[in-house]
């Protein structure tokens, strides 16, 4: 990758730290999936998470809004703070946490209802007051979808193309005004044109939201992110954070040889 391909502004954020992760370990039953993860994730910027398959990238972001707890026999040690609050404190309201931290998955998952009802679903659940028509338009505009669907918001969301469905899922997350948007390989099921639109959308949102994206696409990580985390597994196949820092540094002057080998395609 050339320096010209790093389209995202590499200036560190001035918005502070969104997540502080300290000594985090993650277990599925007795199997340890992640070990000794400590990292700060900056607010109002895009952080990319890269690494070979099976190194715990998706597991890590699922821990950031506690969605991993939906799986059986999961245990998380250590501490994860979101803007200074320990999200695993027993007093934390998980429903409210997930309003603050939206999630977009690999494959588009619109609800089997109208476009309008997809957008208003979250605001209704959380008891938002106000003009729902306005929420729908604002959310769809934020997701760069309004002009394509404004005349058919009362039709089924399942009739949209794959790329449109994924942008609808992003709009649905934005409708509840989250602080953070987690994206787990959001373009893996999309064609190149739809992928480009998602990347352009991420760029427009990065100054408003904290965005954390898992991707196997090195070029995509370079284009959209200001910060990058590289995960790998140790000899016991336990995921670990090898290196993190500004994307430009990770791609062009990594400190760890494993990072350099992965970026250059020598393994992974």
Swiss-Prot record:
This is Phosphate import ATP-binding protein PstB 2. PROSITE patterns: ABC_TRANSPORTER_1 (PS00211), ABC_TRANSPORTER_2 (PS50893), PSTB (PS51238). Its EC number is 7.3.2.1. GO terms for molecular function: ATP binding; ATP hydrolysis activity; ATPase-coupled phosphate ion transmembrane transporter activity. It is a peripheral membrane protein. Residues 19-263 form the ABC transporter domain. InterPro entries: AAA+_ATPase, ABC_transporter-like_ATP-bd, ABC_transporter-like_CS, P-loop_NTPase, PstB-like. Its main location: membrane. It comes from the Bacteria. Part of the ABC transporter complex PstSACB involved in phosphate import. Responsible for energy coupling to the transport system. The complex is composed of two ATP-binding proteins (PstB), two transmembrane proteins (PstC and PstA) and a solute-binding protein (PstS). It is found in: Cell inner membrane. GO terms for cellular component: plasma membrane. It comes from Gloeobacter violaceus (strain ATCC 29082 / PCC 7421). PANTHER family: ABC TRANSPORTER I FAMILY MEMBER 17, PHOSPHATE IMPORT ATP-BINDING PROTEIN PSTB 3. Belongs to the ABC transporter superfamily. Phosphate importer (TC 3.A.1.7) family. GO terms for biological process: phosphate ion transmembrane transport. NCBIfam families: 3a0107s01c2 (TIGR00972). Gene3D superfamilies: P-loop containing nucleotide triphosphate hydrolases.
């Amino acid at each position: 990758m050339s320096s010209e391909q790093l389209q995202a502004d590499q200036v560190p954020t001035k918005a502070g730290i969104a997540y502080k992760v300290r000594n985090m370990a993650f277990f599925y039953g007795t199997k340890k999936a992640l070990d000794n993860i400590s990292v700060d994730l900056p607010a109002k910027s895009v952080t990319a998470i890269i690494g070979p398959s099976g190194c715990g990238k998706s597991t890590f972001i699922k821990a950031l809004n506690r969605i991993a707890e939906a799986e059986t026999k999961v245990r998380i040690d250590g501490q994860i703070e979101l803007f200074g609050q320990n999200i695993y404190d027993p007093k934390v309201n998980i429903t409210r946490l997930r309003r603050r931290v939206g999630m977009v998955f690999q494959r588009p998952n619109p609800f089997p209802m109208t476009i309008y009802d997809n957008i208003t679903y979250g605001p209704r659940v959380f008891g938002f007051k106000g003009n729902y028509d306005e929420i729908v338009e604002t959310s769809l505009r934020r997701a760069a979808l309004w002009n394509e669907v404004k005349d058919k918001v009362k039709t089924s969301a399942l009739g949209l193309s794959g790329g449109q469905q994924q942008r609808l899922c992003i709009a649905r997350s934005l409708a509840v005004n989250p602080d953070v948007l987690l994206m787990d390989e959001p373009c893996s099921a999309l064609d190149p044109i739809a992928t480009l639109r998602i990347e352009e959308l991420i760029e427009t949102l990065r100054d408003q939201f904290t965005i954390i994206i898992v991707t196997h696409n090195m070029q995509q990580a370079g284009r959209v992110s200001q910060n990058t985390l590289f995960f790998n597994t140790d000899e016991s196949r336990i995921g670990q954070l090898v290196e993190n820092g500004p994307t430009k540094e990770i791609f062009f002057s990594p400190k760890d040889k494993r990072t350099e080998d992965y970026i250059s395609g020598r393994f992974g």
